[in-house]
Amino acid sequence: MSDARFGMTIPFDDVPLHEQADWVRELADLGYTDVWSSEANGADAFTPLALASVWAPSLRLGTAIVPAFTRGPACLAQSVGSLAQAAPGRLAFGIGTSSNVIVEGWNGIPFEQPYER
């Protein structure tokens, strides 16, 4: 048995979230082990993973990445905790600084000293 893992980034472009259930289920049927979501365009990182946790219960879920600057610590902990409870043992949480484009340009938050935050 192989320990290899195969992942796909979700949500799929140009497909509404509510129409992606069959696609996500098919990923598991095709042998994919993981789905990953980020916050760059469109949906937040957590909603597609919450949906995938129900649509394909065998898939491991991961954020790649959630920006530390754009949510307060309590709100971020609530989001991670809720998804971890919805999919016990299946969540890999990635957090990072993101970029000045997303933090400052999109959210109007100063992107200062990103590695000290």
Describe each region flagged by the PLM:
Residues 38, 64, 94-96:
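Structural motif
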Residues 1-61, 69:
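N-terminal beta1-alpha1-beta2 module of alpha/beta enzyme domains
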Residues 2-15, 70-117:
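Flexible, glycine-rich active-site loops centered on histidine and acidic residues
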